[in-house]
Amino acid sequence: MYINPKEILETIQMVRMEHLDIRTVTMGISLRDCSHPDIEVFNENIYEKITTRAKELVRTTNEIQSLYGIPIINKRISVTPIAVAAESCRAPDFVSIAKTMDEAAKDAQVDFIGGFSALVHKGATVGDLKLINSIPEALKSTEKVCSSINVATTKTGINMDAVGLMGSIIKKTADLTADRDGIGCAKLVVFANAPEDNPFMAGAFHGIGEPECVINVGVSGPGVVNAAIRELENPNLTEISETIKKTAFKITRMGEMVGREVSRRLGVEFGILDLSLAPTPAIGDSVAAILEAMGLERCGAHGTTAALALLNDAVKKGGAMASSSVGGLSGAFIPVSEDAGMIEAVRAGALNLEKLEAMTSVCSVGLDMIAVPGDTPASTLSAIIADEMAIGVINRKTTAVRVIPAPGKRVGDSVEFGGLLGNAPIMPLSNFSSETFVKRGGRIPAPIQSLTN
């Protein structure tokens, strides 16, 4: 890969002034060879494998950060979905597995570990149900463990039994972490069409089709894109799209360079580069700010969905030109609590849940880090999930829900999670019930592929 001096100077500017960073270097580790009927033996096996494989991850990424001067914010691990790896365990629940994962993550000095996960888009096995029912206690008892459940795919439809169950699981998780504003729910995501190579939390897991061990990288550059657009003089939307493509190209080249060097030093296969524009609470490092730079008075105004579609498509086009290893989610994230512009838009009354839902039809993932009143019924949470899953299934894309029913909070309040998770204003929901619909259960069939209107 040839990189000229001008690109190096541009990258320095991006890092120093525009919040460019590598959001995560995530090591994916297969645990399929760790299976054992005795959960104690299984826990020993996964602890040994995780800590052995990841023992040099943090040191190596820190060295590369110092060498290139490019911040690497998080070092993470993803593992085989535990519901798969632990299927043969005879224990009544999998909480001890989550605790073992947490200990392994702490010993490896990584920020998060993902993969306390199950894939139940067509139905649930005994192991799947053990894992799902263990989630509230597991997230209460751990610091670094993240959980994800895939409940729908375009090929199979939506498992409404699983959707109904996840509303209750989210509610219970919030209650068990009420002393921290329900932060357990910030580490739990429900997917449609979940990718197997996603490096971002809380949805990362090491897919069944993945190799023994792999490095996946997630870049982040909303501030860079925002600055590039604002430097243009009265551009039309075609010119804005071209600028975003060129900027995404540069960001991607930097990310691939770092990812391949980490892989080379660790002797591990390089997997994918996720192009997702992941915002932070820092001013200017915001997807909402990009949309406003295009000409919207506030994110959430009419035209927001179109602007986001332009952004998402241009990022993918620019990134795909720069790398043949693009994967994961790759687009623009719209997590409310993690984006200063989104937070301000909600507080100004410009952005509501219904508009966010429309935006998810064209963005990278879905309803992300949404805080809602603590007294929200579990059935309403399930209905929110069902709506979002439908968007993903019909549009053949990944969608997800990460929602926090903040205990004791009402509309007008806010919750503070700190760090990259930021803070979130409590958003209002419909007062009308979806309970009967959710309780019907069953499966919403896969959509027809030939008649697409």
From Swiss-Prot:
Protein origin, superkingdom: Archaea
PANTHER family: UPF0210 PROTEIN MJ1665, UPF0210 PROTEIN SPR0218
Protein name: UPF0210 protein Mbar_A3181
Pfam families: DUF711
Family indicated by similarity: Belongs to the UPF0210 family.
Source organism of this protein record: Methanosarcina barkeri (strain Fusaro / DSM 804)
InterPro entries tied to this protein: UPF0210
